[in-house]
């Protein structure tokens, strides 16, 4: 069979699609995968042929579009960000029409799901969405809030999303010869019976599966999808770890950090206060600029699967993939969140009693030392190991997701053949 995967975002958003694509390819299927231009080398190095799809993520971050949306009280930044959203939609619509031609199923992520849903409707093929956090309306996403309020917040978010995307979506549907949409893309996706794979562990959101029981097998939980690729630095880092006490890992993925130099200095000082070593991952462009300390090792990339279990604790931005890696590693976690869905994971880490969370911009040397002191208490390590034993295994998650896509596509092919008889 032929599968088209359309991914957008940073490595944390793209890697699950690459992991799924590799498994489908291993099973003998034809896989076409579109990724942001800056992710092409990464996906191809994993063993997949990829094409450019959508905006360059690093250029997006360099324009600081994230901060434009945070400056909601100013008019021009949101307008500029909206223009960028519409241009990205138009570009993706053009690219995807050719990428999905002849496919038996097309799959994407949540943010630009409407682009892909329209193309799937045009070709009359099944459609799937990978969810890295509970994005559909539910009452469980923020455990500290009442269920009705959680549902109201998510419903408002999706209505706002539709209003923002309505103009480029209308243009795309005209181009495809489809009727004008009169309801939210989320409603249309659900109505079409799309496969919405929840690529995180069910235990992170207790009660969610029961709340979504009406959707049957259309919202299955499989766990995080990852390639678990090794890096050239892994052996050296593991040797450094073995030569002393287990360090605390710090890394913030692709998130924009205003001053890497100040951040490294803050981390070094907080760890020195506690008598701890630090392993800090920085972007390659910052490697030569950040300060050096005897109790700190600076790296540009490590395998989370290889290194996290050897650390005393993990501090990160709260991306879904990194959160899953720290939970699977069985070590306490501190999430210093930066953007949109990351506070959700901070709240779940706290609810699971395996760590704590705080907004990155509100973090100081004193607060960091205090948060680390909290999560380094023995009960957090004990609880983290307990949770790790209940987490899905990476290979099981990828296999389960591939099984679901095969089943969805094959059932549609069988139905199509029957209708043609």
Curated annotation (Swiss-Prot):
What top-level branch of life does the organism fall under? Bacteria
One Gene Ontology term of the molecular function aspect: hexosyltransferase activity
Q: Which Gene3D superfamilies match?
A: Glycogen Phosphorylase B
One GO-annotated biological process of the protein: vancomycin biosynthetic process
EC number from the UniProt entry: 2.4.-.-
Keyword terms, alphabetized: Glycosyltransferase, Transferase
Top enzyme category:
transferase
SUPFAM superfamilies from the UniProt entry: UDP-Glycosyltransferase/glycogen phosphorylase
Q: Which InterPro entries match?
A: EryCIII-like_C (IPR010610), Glycosyltransferase_28 (IPR050426), GlycoTrans_28_N (IPR004276), UDP_glucos_trans (IPR002213)
Which family does the record assign? Belongs to the glycosyltransferase 28 family.
Q: What's the protein name?
A: Uncharacterized glycosyltransferase ML2348
Report the source organism.
Mycobacterium leprae (strain TN)
């Amino acid at each position: 069979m032929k599968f088209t995967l359309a991914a957008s975002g940073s490595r944390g958003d793209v890697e699950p699609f690459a992991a799924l694509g590799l498994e489908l390819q291993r099973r003998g299927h034809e896989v076409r995968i579109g990724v942001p231009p800056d992710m092409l080398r990464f996906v191809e190095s994993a063993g997949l042929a990829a094409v450019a799809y959508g905006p360059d993520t690093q250029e997006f971050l360099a324009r600081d579009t994230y901060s434009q949306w945070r400056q909601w009280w100013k008019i021009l930044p949101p307008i500029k960000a909206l223009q960028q959203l519409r241009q990205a939609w138009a570009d993706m619509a053009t690219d995807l029409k050719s990428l999905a031609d002849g496919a038996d199923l097309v799959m994407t992520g949540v943010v630009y799901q409407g682009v892909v849903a329209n193309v799937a409707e045009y070709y009359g093929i099944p459609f799937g969405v990978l969810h890295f956090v509970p994005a559909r309306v539910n009452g469980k996403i923020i455990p500290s809030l009442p269920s009705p309020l959680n549902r109201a917040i998510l419903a408002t978010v999706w209505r706002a999303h539709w209003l923002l995307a309505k103009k480029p979506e209308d243009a795309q549907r005209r181009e495809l010869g489809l009727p004008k949409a009169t309801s939210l893309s989320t409603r249309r996706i659900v109505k079409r019976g799309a496969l919405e794979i929840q690529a995180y562990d069910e235990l992170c959101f207790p009660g969610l599966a029961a709340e979504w029981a009406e959707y049957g097998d259309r919202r299955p939980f499989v766990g995080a999808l990852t390639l678990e690729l090794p890096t050239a630095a892994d052996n050296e880092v593991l040797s450094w770890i073995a030569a002393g006490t287990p360090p605390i890992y710090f890394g913030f993925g692709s998130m924009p950090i205003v001053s890497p130099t100040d951040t490294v200095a803050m981390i070094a000082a907080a760890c020195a206060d506690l008598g701890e070593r630090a392993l800090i991952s920085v972007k390659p462009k910052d490697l030569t600029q950040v300060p050096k300390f005897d109790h700190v090792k600076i790296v540009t990339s490590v395998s989370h699967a290889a290194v996290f279990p050897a650390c005393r604790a993990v501090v990160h931005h709260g991306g879904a993939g990194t959160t899953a890696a720290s939970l699977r590693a069985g070590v306490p976690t501190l999430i210093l969140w930066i953007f949109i869905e990351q506070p959700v994971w901070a709240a779940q880490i706290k609810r699971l009693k395996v760590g704590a969370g705080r907004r990155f911009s509100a973090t100081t040397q004193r607060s960091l030392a205090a948060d680390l002191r909290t999560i380094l208490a023995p009960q957090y390590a004990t609880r983290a190991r307990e949770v790790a034993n209940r987490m899905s295994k990476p290979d099981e998650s990828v296999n389960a997701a591939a099984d679901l896509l095969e089943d969805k596509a094959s059932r549609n092919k069988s139905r199509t053949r029957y209708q043609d008889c």
